[in-house]
């Protein structure tokens, strides 16, 4: 009987000591996506870019002569949130692609070849 009473008294003590899990807290970030490239000789780079923005998971962008860049400022993100883009471009001789979060380069990719680079460039980063 004594053991049962002691056990019953011990349960509320354990419950009071239980650490509650807290949800990850949001923080405001500046996220910059960037792709610059060089076209194959006697050709132009063409294609499309889709990216995760603070307002849409499927925003789109266009390639210009100098490349593509977009910055999302004041973006409330929490650990585990994913940012990134896919650039589907053709006639590239070389490219450099990056994701920059709060001024720090988090992801980077580059390639150069004599053959056209006609495959998607995909970069993503998970907020820590």
Predicted features and spans:
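Bacterial Sec-dependent N-terminal signal peptides
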Residues: 6-7, 11-35
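First exposed extracellular module after export/assembly in secreted or surface-exposed proteins
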Residues: 24-128
């Amino acid at each position: 009987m004594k053991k049962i009473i002691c056990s019953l008294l011990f349960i509320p003590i354990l419950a009071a000591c239980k650490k509650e899990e807290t949800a990850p807290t949001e923080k405001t970030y500046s996220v910059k996506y960037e792709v610059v490239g060089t076209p194959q000789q006697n050709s132009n780079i063409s294609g499309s870019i889709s990216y995760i923005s603070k307002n849409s998971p499927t925003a789109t962008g266009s390639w210009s002569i100098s490349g593509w860049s977009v910055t999302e400022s004041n973006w409330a993100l929490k650990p585990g949130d994913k940012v990134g883009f896919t650039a589907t471009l053709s006639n590239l001789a070389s490219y450099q692609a990056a994701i920059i979060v709060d001024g720090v380069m988090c992801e980077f990719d580059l390639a150069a070849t004599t053959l056209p680079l006609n495959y998607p460039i995909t970069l993503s980063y998970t907020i820590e």
